[in-house]
A protein has these predicted regions:
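N-terminal phosphate-binding or glycine-rich loops at protein starts, especially the Walker A/P-loop
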Residues: 1-44
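Short, glycine-rich nucleotide/cofactor-binding loops
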Residues: 7-17, 147-157, 296-302
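Short glycine/serine/threonine-rich phosphate/pyrophosphate-binding segments
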Residues: 15-19, 82-96, 100-114, 125-129, ...
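Glycine-rich phosphate/diphosphate-binding loop of Rossmann-like nucleotide-binding domains
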Residues: 17-18, 30, 35-37, 149-211, ...
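Phosphate/nucleotide-donor binding subsite
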Residues: 54-98
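Glycine-rich phosphate/nucleotide-binding loop
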Residues: 115-128, 132-142, 222-226, 230-325
Length: 326
């Protein structure tokens, strides 16, 4: 089945070089009839493409002369920059010209544009960004990590359902355990939104709900899905990134301070562990709940991130995750 994947060439800190490089690298792993669409200023993209060898029938360019910066206000920027790469990306999906869209650009603008153009799945109130956290007990899906910072109980309940489907069919977890992020495991803990969400989740017999969880439980692998609002989820995500990076730097420093020979001995082990926790290996995070396949990547995405995001979007689309959610 032919798939058309549109990529925001101007999204992220390393655009367009790394985005285009990652797009080109993904070609070998895709089916011969899959097509890639690079969205952004045509002159800049075409100039970059001259550095790559590829089948011109497989990679096309959709001109989008404007770019939304990472620090711009999402709704306002989309209104002013109708020819921005994010806006054009969303339009391609709406018109049925792209089966999946990918961007490492302004997260708020991506969420707003994709939701506005692609619309939500039936009965889904608000979409949520689902990120996979690797643990030694298996992958944990955290949803939401930034799409919706002011959740209602129904939003958290629906995040649990959607992330559970994602965990089961993408990560192959047979009966995902769902935990609700709170400030304590006891039922009395948490604000009113969390308490009401817990009642909704617990009342659904189709959900394998284990109750409240705390921040430390995620990396312990206590659950397979952690549900929270976008504010809490984003703090957890950024804190974990910094923690992992700082921890590895500290270990590297201590090993080198001892003996270079000792450091070299542990290098393969450290490399394997670091790879396990490297977000570049996982590509992007799906925006669950929109009526289509949308993947949002880290702002610091490299070519490897984009390549993996493209492959992840194909997997999401091919396995018909949205059909399973509905």
């Amino acid at each position: 089945m032919t798939m058309r994947i549109a990529i925001d060439a101007m999204g992220g800190d390393n655009a367009p070089d790394e985005i285009i490089a990652g797009t080109m690298e993904s070609i070998q792993a895709l089916a011969p009839d899959d097509r890639l669409i690079l969205v952004g200023p045509a002159d800049r993209i075409n100039a970059q493409l001259e550095n790559h060898e590829f089948d011109v029938d497989r990679v096309t360019v959709a001109d989008a002369p404007e770019v939304i910066g990472m620090d711009e206000i999402p709704i306002e920027s989309l209104r002013k920059k109708v020819k921005s790469s994010i806006a054009v990306l969303a339009k391609l999906a709406k018109r049925g010209q792209a089966d999946a869209v990918i961007s490492a650009g302004n997260t708020g603008a991506c969420v707003a544009a994709f939701q506005m153009r692609m619309r939500n799945l039936p009965d889904v109130n608000r979409p949520g960004i689902a990120v996979v956290f690797p643990t030694f007990e298996g992958p944990v899906v955290v949803c939401d990590v930034g799409a919706n910072i002011a959740c209602k109980p129904i939003n958290l309940y629906q995040y649990g359902i959607m992330a559970s489907v994602y965990s089961k069919h993408i990560l192959q977890v047979e009966n995902p355990r769902i935990g609700l992020m709170s400030i304590g495991q006891e039922d009395a803990k948490g604000n009113e939104v969390v308490k009401k969400a817990r009642e909704l989740i617990r009342a659904d017999s189709n959900i394998n709900f284990i109750g409240n969880i705390e921040g430390r439980d995620i990396l312990r692998g206590v659950c397979d899905v952690a549900v929270c609002d976008g504010f809490v989820g984003n703090v957890i995500l950024k804190l974990t990134e910094g923690l992992v990076d700082g921890l590895f730097k500290a270990i590297k420093h201590e090993l080198l301070a001892e003996k270079l020979r000792l450091a070299m001995k542990f290098k393969p082990v450290m490399t394997r562990i670091y790879k396990k926790y490297d977000y570049n290996e996982y590509g992007g995070a799906p925006l669950l709940g929109v009526n289509g396949t949308a993947v949002i990547c880290h702002g610091a995405s490299t070519a490897k991130t984009i390549t993996n995001a493209i492959l992840a979007s194909k997997n999401f689309h091919t396995k018909k995750i949205n059909h399973k959610i509905v």
